[in-house]
Amino acid sequence: LEAYVEDAFANTVSESNLQKRNERISKVFSYLGNQNNPPDIILKAGDAIEVKKIQSKGAAIALNSSYPKNKLHSDDSKITDACRDCEDWTTKDIIYAIGVTSDKNLKHLWLVYGDCYAASRNIYTRIGKTIKEGVKEIEDIEFSETKELGRVNRVDPLGITNLRIRGM
């Protein structure tokens, strides 16, 4: 699905020559991401694109421990340095490209701007901060700061189990 979205934005859907496709891709996009960090793609001097695959129209969108974004911010801890440095920017509009797929067939594709889909980031960060503070108030626990919401270490009597506190 991600390659199809790249091809759709780069106008290379019917390009069979891989070298020509790659040249066009490098002209159109300033950043091609990875599976672990948002976004998947950034258009040069343009919007960020996050590709999401679902199996049916009513399925939930997996956000991989990250809250939905109404905008992409360069100070977001979830993005990579390569993304942050791909061009000079502080805030970008983000497009969610949501595809309904079955095996290798694309049934539906929606393009939804983040500001039509998600609340502002302070809504999500406020909730995350409140959860962290609440967990820290529990007596006799060892709380660790992580890139996620946090971790409680040694939750069992043997001290061998940790509880990861993750976002969405």
Predicted features and spans:
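Nucleic-acid endonuclease domains
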Residues: 1-47, 53-168
